[in-house]
């Protein structure tokens, strides 16, 4: 009997310590507990939409409900619902306000005259408590228009055409608690217009044309809690105590105006203010003492303004602040100790801000911070003690991996291997094709070298993705600022530009020899070598120039994890944006147009010149072959560059482009030419096919030599002319001497000569 209480006490004590140990789990910096489990998960696995804990603890409490804006939004939604016609649908009570105008509804002491085509305030019984006059044609509020409605508690005048409000329009409304004047045309409110509204708690005047206000505008509003002046035309706030006659004001909303600055006297009397919303204005100056007297402020929203400099002590008196939003401002620098006084801060929004001096010290004093929002997910590594950090990805990379998509992680190796192997194979095999046109072969080898660099670039990106696998957020920012990333980005641009210029050079060389066969514009060795060297020099200058002037180009190649500057707008440098446009919409677009025009002209020239000297049937067959080859050359160029041209045009037009596009372009679109050029310019040509046929025939000959020793050896010529179709050439053109100078051949052999440069 005595052992029962003893074991009961042991059970209770054990339970207590078990729960305590589970709830007080100590996790290393950057990790957080899984609820009441002893397991810890890193920051990147919390609030990512996946149940990594197994009990969904890592996905609990991920919503940012700091401040009381969410609760007020719900209340706001309820008010609109209550003020609408739906609130009068279930008429269970009789009307107690006497006769009402046509098209109006009545229930108890509530009157709904929404969309009743009214042009003036209706006259009903004085005991009405709620009057909704929304979406009518009321233009003015005359003196004493509501004087007899002493019991009126809620007045809704939204979506009328009110442009004039008499100073005594609201006289006598001593019981009014909520007044809605939104979506009208009010330009000015005279001082004392709200003088009798001593019980008013909510005043909503959003979406009007108010251009100025003064403290006297709100005289008499001793009970006002909420003041909303969103989307008006205010350009400045009075340099006087705005809350002088609103001592109980808690919520003040100036969103969507044109306010340029905040001075130190404006909020001096707003001692009870808990929420201040100043987003989407044109604020470019903040007085250091602008918020000194807002010691009860819980939420401050300064987002989407034009603030460039934050005074060092601007937030020092906001001891109670739990939510701060300074996102989407062109802030040049954030001081390391900028947030030191905000110990109670729970939510911090820094979206759209490039923080060049970011470091962990900046956020370490924010011990209660649970939500933080950055421009780049790479910044999350500098706030490891914050459970919810957004964004989780930039579309290219994620908190875990340099390449966010498994498809990209696989195909970066596949495309890299195809590009490198194809071009190296051509470089090695090209000397064995004994073509008389060595200058053309030299250009093709140079093209393969440039294309091979693209494969090297993709290989390195894949290697670093493998190196950072599972913990990329720890290395993201250092990686994008590293020499490796800068060099790889330069290598990609070098490959791209040299390849484009070489393709243009090869195309123009063909064009001149086909369209102008009797001109003295034949390619010479010295000229060809000079052009090739010049192209590579231009490529090096274009690719490495951004590394030589960091002030002008900023972090040109370090705007994303793949180090490719497709969206140069992210650098924040006008010079970088112009440079990127010159490359992609200047050099590359002009080159693409030249290639398309040249191949079209060549095909037309061959068609016009050959029809009179060859049989029609053979000519049609030959032109089909030429058309197919020209089509694939132009098609691959278009497939590679048209998407990039479109993206650059859209970015110039400030169209929002998903960040994930960059990685798909870099892995699947940009290398198209690099991967297919070896096939188009070498592997599908007649000389290469003949060489392979010869090697295969010789191999079979060696296999059968023991059985057929007396058989005459097959001895095909080693002089291969790069052309198509070979069998259609006359015997005279099969002699090596006939090809010593392709530009001197007759007009009849133009199509064959064209093939000799393929």
From Swiss-Prot:
Alphabetized InterPro entries for the sequence = GPCR_Rhodpsn (IPR000276), GPCR_Rhodpsn_7TM (IPR017452), LDL_receptor-like_sf (IPR036055), LDLR_class-A_CS (IPR023415), LDrepeatLR_classA_rpt (IPR002172), Leu-rich_rpt (IPR001611), Leu-rich_rpt_typical-subtyp (IPR003591), LRR_dom_sf (IPR032675)
Please list the residue ranges covered by the LRR repeats.
127-148, 151-172, 175-196, 199-220, 223-244, 248-269, 272-293, 296-317, 320-341, 344-365
TM region positions: 410-430, 444-464, 487-507, 528-548, 578-598, 630-650, 652-672
Q: What does this protein do?
A: Receptor for relaxins. The activity of this receptor is mediated by G proteins leading to stimulation of adenylate cyclase and an increase of cAMP. Binding of the ligand may also activate a tyrosine kinase pathway that inhibits the activity of a phosphodiesterase that degrades cAMP.
Disulfide bonds, paired cysteine numbers? 27-40, 34-53, 47-62, 485-563
The segments annotated as topological domain Extracellular are 1-409, 465-486, 549-577, 651
Q: Which molecular function GO terms apply here? A: G protein-coupled receptor activity; hormone binding; metal ion binding
* Listed name of the protein: Relaxin receptor 1
Q: Which Gene3D superfamilies match?
A: Low-density Lipoprotein Receptor, Rhodopsin 7-helix transmembrane proteins, Ribonuclease Inhibitor
Q: Which domain of life is it from?
A: Eukaryota
Q: What is its main location?
A: membrane
């Amino acid at each position: 009997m005595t052992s029962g209480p003893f074991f009961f006490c042991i059970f209770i004590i054990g339970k207590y310590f078990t729960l305590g140990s589970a709830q007080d789990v100590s996790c290393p910096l950057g990790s957080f507990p899984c609820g009441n489990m002893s397991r810890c998960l890193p920051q990147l696995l919390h609030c990512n939409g996946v149940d990594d804990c197994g009990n969904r603890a890592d996905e609990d409490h991920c919503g940012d409900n700091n401040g009381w804006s969410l609760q007020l939004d719900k209340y706001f939604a309820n008010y609109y619902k209550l003020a609408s016609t739906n609130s009068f649908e279930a008429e269970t009570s009789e009307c107690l306000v006497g006769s009402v105008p046509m098209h109006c509804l009545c229930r108890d002491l509530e009157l709904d005259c929404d969309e009743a085509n009214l042009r003036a305030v209706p006259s009903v019984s004085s005991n009405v408590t709620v009057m909704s006059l929304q979406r009518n044609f009321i233009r003015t509020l005359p003196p004493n228009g509501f004087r007899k409605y002493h019991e009126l508690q809620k007045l809704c005048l939204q979506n009328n055409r009110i442009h004039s409000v008499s100073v005594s329009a609201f006289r006598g409304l001593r019981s009014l608690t909520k007044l809605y004047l939104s979506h009208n045309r009010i330009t000015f409110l005279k001082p004392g217009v709200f003088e009798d509204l001593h019980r008013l708690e909510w005043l909503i005047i959003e979406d009007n044309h108010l251009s100025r206000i003064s403290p006297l505008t709100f005289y008499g509003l001793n009970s006002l809690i909420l003041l909303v002046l969103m989307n008006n035309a205010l350009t400045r706030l009075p340099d006087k105590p705005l809350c002088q006659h609103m001592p109980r004001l808690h919520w003040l909303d100036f969103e969507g105006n044109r306010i340029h600055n905040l001075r130190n006297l404006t909020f001096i009397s707003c001692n009870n203010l808990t929420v201040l919303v100043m987003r989407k204005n044109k604020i470019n100056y903040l007085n250091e003492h602008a918020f000194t007297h807002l010691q009860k402020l819980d939420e401050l929203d300064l987002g989407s303004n034009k603030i460039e400099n934050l005074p060092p002590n601007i937030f020092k008196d906001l001891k109670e602040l739990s939510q701060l939003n300074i996102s989407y401002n062109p802030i040049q620098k954030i001081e390391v100790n900028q947030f030191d006084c905000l110990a109670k801060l729970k939510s911090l929004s820094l979206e759209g801000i490039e923080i060049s001096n970011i470091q962990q010290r900046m956020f370490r004093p924010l011990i209660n911070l649970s939500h933080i929002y950055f421009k780049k997910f790479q910044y999350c590594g500098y706030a490891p003690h914050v459970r919810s950090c957004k964004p989780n990805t930039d579309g290219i990379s994620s908190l875990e991996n340099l390449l966010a998509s498994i498809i990209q992680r696989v195909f970066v190796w596949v495309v890299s291997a195809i590009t490198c192997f194809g071009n190296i194979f051509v470089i090695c095999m090209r000397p064995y094709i004994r073509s008389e046109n060595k200058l053309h072969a030299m250009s093709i080898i140079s093209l393969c070298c440039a294309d091979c660099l693209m494969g090297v670039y993709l290989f390195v990106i894949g290697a670093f993705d493998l190196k950072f696998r599972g913990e990329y957020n720890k290395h993201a920012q250092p990686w994008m600022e590293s020499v490796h990333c800068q060099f790889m980005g330069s290598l990609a641009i070098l490959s791209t530009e040299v390849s484009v210029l070489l393709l243009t050079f090869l195309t123009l060389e063909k064009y001149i020899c086909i369209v102008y066969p009797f001109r003295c514009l034949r390619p010479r060795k010295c000229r060809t070598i000079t052009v090739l060297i010049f192209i590579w020099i231009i490529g090096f200058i274009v690719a490495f120039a951004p590394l030589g002037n960091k002030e002008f180009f900023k972090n040109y190649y370090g705007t994303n994890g793949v180090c490719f500057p497709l969206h140069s707008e992210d650098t924040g440098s006008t010079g970088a944006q112009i440079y990127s446009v010159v490359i992609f919409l200047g050099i590359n677009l002009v080159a693409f147009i030249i290639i398309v025009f040249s191949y079209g002209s060549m095909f037309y020239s061959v068609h016009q010149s050959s029809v009179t000297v060859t049989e029609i049937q053979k000519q049609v067959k030959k032109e089909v072959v030429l058309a197919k080859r020209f089509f694939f050359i132009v098609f691959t160029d278009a497939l590679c560059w048209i998407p990039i041209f479109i993206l650059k045009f859209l970015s110039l037009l400030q169209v929002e482009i998903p960040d994930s596009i960059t990685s798909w372009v870099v892995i699947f679109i940009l290398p198209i030419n690099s991967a297919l050029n070896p096939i188009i310019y070498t592997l599908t040509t007649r000389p290469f096919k003949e060489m392979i046929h010869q090697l295969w025939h010789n191999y079979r000959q060696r296999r059968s030599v023991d059985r057929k020793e007396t058989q005459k050896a097959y001895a095909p010529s080693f002089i291969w002319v790069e052309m198509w179709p070979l069998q259609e050439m006359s015997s005279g053109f099969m002699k090596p001497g006939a090809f010593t100078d392709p530009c001197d051949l007759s007009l009849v052999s133009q199509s064959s000569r064209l093939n000799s440069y393929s």
